C-alpha cells in the first residue's frame, strides 16, 4: 500500500508571530513570554529533553519522562507525566494554537485557549500513518481510525474505517484535514469540529 501524505501550510491571513521563546539551561526549561515574563521549571536529575518547539501562542518540551506545554496566558508550565517507553515512541507537532503528542496508545492535544491537555486512546496494534498539528486543527490517522482536534474544542473527534477500507491519501491544511480512502472522502474542518464522510462509489 502506498500512502501519499502531504502536509500543506495554507494559513489564511497574516502569519501569527511567535510570542514565546524557549530554552533549556542548567537542568531547567525556560519560557520567555512576549519578551517580558519568564517562567522556568526544574527538571529531575537525569531527565533528558528529546524535543522542543515554540510557535505562535505555544511553547513545548518533550522529555524522557514528561510533556511540558506553556501558552501566552499561562502562569506556569503545564505538565503531563508519561509512562515508561512512551517518550521514545512519541511523535510531537506544534502549531500556533495546538500542541500534539502521539505515543504508542494515546494522542494528547493541548489547546492554547483552554490551557489544558486533551487525551484520547488509540487502537492497540494500529499503524500510525500521520500525526500533525496545523494552524487550527490537529489530526492523527491510524490504520483503522482518524482523529481530529480543532482549536477551542474539548475533545478529539473520531471516525472508524470500515473492514477492508484502506487509506490512499492524506492532506492537512491550516483549518482542514482531508483523508481519501478506497471507499470514501473524509473531511475534518475547524468550523464543524466533526468528521464528514462522502461516498466515492
PLM features: residue spans?
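N-terminal, post-signal-peptide region of Sec/Tat-exported proteins
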Residues: 31-67
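Blade-level signature of beta-propeller repeat domains, shared across WD40, Kelch, NHL, RCC1
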Residues: 180-201
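A short beta-strand motif characteristic of beta-propeller blades
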Residues: 36-43, 47, 76-82, 116-122, ...
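Structural motif
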Residues: 27-30, 65-71, 105-111, 144-150, ...
Amino acid at each position: 500500500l502506498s500512502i501519499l501524505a502531504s502536509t500543506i501550510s495554507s494559513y489564511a491571513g497574516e502569519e501569527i508571530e511567535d510570542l514565546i521563546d524557549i530554552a533549556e539551561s542548567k537542568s531547567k526549561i525556560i519560557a520567555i513570554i512576549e519578551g517580558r515574563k519568564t517562567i522556568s521549571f526544574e527538571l529531575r536529575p537525569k531527565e533528558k529533553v528529546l524535543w522542543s518547539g515554540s510557535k505562535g501562542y505555544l511553547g513545548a518540551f518533550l522529555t524522557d519522562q514528561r510533556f511540558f506545554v506553556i501558552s501566552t496566558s499561562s502562569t506556569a508550565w503545564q505538565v503531563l507525566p508519561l509512562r515508561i517507553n512512551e517518550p521514545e515512541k512519541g511523535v510531537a507537532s506544534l502549531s500556533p494554537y495546538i500542541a500534539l503528542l502521539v505515543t504508542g496508545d494515546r494522542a494528547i492535544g493541548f489547546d492554547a485557549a483552554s490551557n489544558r491537555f486533551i487525551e484520547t486512546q488509540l487502537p492497540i496494534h494500529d499503524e500510525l500513518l500521520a500525526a500533525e498539528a496545523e494552524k487550527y486543527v490537529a489530526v492523527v490517522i491510524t490504520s483503522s481510525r482518524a482523529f481530529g482536534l480543532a482549536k477551542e474544542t474539548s475533545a478529539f473527534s473520531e471516525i472508524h474505517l470500515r473492514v477492508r477500507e484502506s487509506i490512499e491519501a492524506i492532506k492537512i491544511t491550516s483549518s482542514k484535514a482531508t483523508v481519501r480512502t478506497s471507499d470514501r472522502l473524509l473531511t475534518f474542518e475547524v468550523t464543524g469540529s466533526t468528521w464528514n464522510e462522502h461516498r466515492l462509489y
